[in-house]
Swiss-Prot record:
Source domain of life: Bacteria
One of the protein's GO biological processes: phospholipid biosynthetic process
Gene: plsY
The UniProt record lists the keyword Transport: no
Name listed for the protein in its UniProt record: Glycerol-3-phosphate acyltransferase
Length: 203
């Protein structure tokens, strides 16, 4: 790995470590998403506690955390496999943020943002898959899992040279969802839009 790729990997992790959900909730004077609802600082949980506007802002910011470093690396001529490493670094920053006590989200939106530079057709297929599963079953986590399982196949169909890095990224997302998988099997996973909240954790 050359110096440019190492630098972009570090930048990607640090950018990913900026928790959009926590900062936006602070600005809007909403509860800390790490202590209410699903305790996950992501767009779905912010939707539960703050509504569509706040959730959309979180979604956009989380996607940009993946898009900016990967797109920058692409234009700097970094090879596809190393772009995958940069994407993983951005997602790891989102999942284990340096600036927020390593309490982060699941990385789905950041991963989508990282994949977006590959092409709008691939991005559209991924988003359509997520929306279809989410509408049919009302589980954000299930939609994410189905989408990441299909994403490498979509990538192979469109730009096969990026299949390996996308597959690496998707494996990380699946591992991060291990608790959601357990709750889906036990029937305890909250559905999209549910308003039932837990009391904030004591600081």
């Amino acid at each position: 790995m050359d110096a440019m790729a190492v630098t972009m990997t570090i930048i990607a992790y640090l950018l990913g470590s900026i928790s959009s959900a926590v900062l936006i909730c602070r600005v809007l004077r909403l509860p800390d998403p790490r202590g209410v609802g699903s305790n996950n600082p992501g767009a779905t949980n912010v939707l539960r506690i703050g509504g569509k506007g706040a959730a959309a802002a979180v979604l956009l910011c989380d996607m940009l955390k993946g898009t900016i470093p990967v797109w920058s690396g692409y234009y700097l001529g970094i090879e596809p496999v190393l772009l995958g490493v940069i994407a993983i670094a951005a997602c790891l920053g989102h999942m284990y943020p340096l600036f927020f006590h390593f309490q982060g989200g699941k990385g789905v939106a950041t991963a989508l943002g990282a994949i977006a530079p590959i092409g709008l057709d691939l991005t559209g297929m991924i988003m359509a898959t997520w929306l279809l599963v989410a509408i049919l079953f009302r589980y954000s986590s299930l939609a994410a899992l189905v989408t990441v399982l299909l994403a490498p196949m979509y990538t192979w169909m469109i730009k096969p040279q990026y299949t390996l890095p996308v597959g690496m990224l998707c494996c990380l997302i699946v591992l991060r969802h291990h608790q959601n998988i357990r709750r889906l099997f036990t029937g305890e996973e909250p559905k999209i839009g549910e308003k039932k909240l837990q009391m904030p954790k004591s600081q």
